[in-house]
Amino acid sequence: DGSLVVNRPDALRNFNEKVSISLFPHVTPKTLISCAEKELRGFIAKQDKTVVKPLDGMGGKSIFIIDKNDLNTRSILEAVTSDFTKTIMAQTYVPEITAGDKRIHIVNGKHCEVLLARIPSETDHRGNLVMGAKPEVQPLSDRDKEICNTIAPTLVENGILFAGIDVIGDFLTEINITSPTGMREIDKYHQYSVSAILFNQLEKILNEK
């Protein structure tokens, strides 16, 4: 009995929102998680462009794009890794970010029918609303649904009732379980209501207890 906890507490510990995508390598971009300079520079050298970001960041903070021959590479890595003492994520750059960083909500193992694309501004590469990205509600593509259906059983198995995944192009980039934002924007710009689906599901679970 007692209160209903949305997303099991041990899932908050076990599912780092960036690292957890490594459970699904067939639907993610090429990715390296490391703090070692040699490993990071070796990975960057094999990509045309690389995105680097901290594992505990949010809102697009401290996310950088590094070109293969960028003379600022070491300086950027020093800053993001705190002089190679802090583990970060490096991913091959997905050019479809210009069409939007797609937030898709999954409620109790089922994806919602629309997503929120956060389209970067002309002056910033980051698809975050707080960084000036433009919100646009869109239907899910077949690939979006495939990604959702791939990860949904793992979410349910680990007690994650509500998640907001990030998809760029055809690739999963994050699984957000502490701050799966975007509901309010979808509710505002579209007749489809993610919040109604979530609370209907919560009510159903409570009634079954």
Spans of features found by a protein language model:
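Anionic group-transfer/hydrolysis microenvironments
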Residues: 9, 55, 93-94, 105, ...
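Hydrophobic beta-strand scaffold residues
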Residues: 5, 50-51
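Phosphate-binding site of ATP-dependent enzymes
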Residues: 37-38, 45-49, 56-145, 155
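Short glycine/proline- and charge-enriched loop/turn segments
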Residues: 25, 129-134, 179-181
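Short glycine-enriched loops at secondary-structure junctions
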Residues: 9-13, 118-120, 168-171
